[in-house]
Amino acid sequence: YPKHIIPHIITSLKNKGEVELLENSKKNKRSFLHNIDSCRAILALLGSIEALDGSVYNVATDEEISIVELVELIASKLGIKEPAILFSGYRASDPERRILNTEKIRQRARWEPIVKLSQGLDMCLGKECKE
């Protein structure tokens, strides 16, 4: 199972028109953060006296999506109407949700993510450069 799911999905759809996923992917929910927002979070923390106390901060978005929904979203952006999704294997240790609580960074550093998943995928796929 790939460590980096978005590049795996894009490459599989472009090369084969299908994606192989674990059975868990039918239910698993994830949130994805764009690098722009990661960098903005670091800058917000460095610029906040209140945040410079040695604390650990979760940096994430509240936007949840299942892996299957992610495949469908990426496929639609690639012009693939009905992507073939093949399910095989199961990872028992794979949590159903990987969603972080970001209340502390939002309050102390006044940080909010600004890049939505769909927009980040457009950037990744080069759509914004064409428009």
Regions found by a protein language model. Name each.
Residues 1-6, 29:
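Flexible, glycine-rich beta-alpha linker
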Residues 13-131:
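C-terminal substrate-binding subdomain of Rossmann-fold SDR/epimerase-dehydratase oxidoreductases
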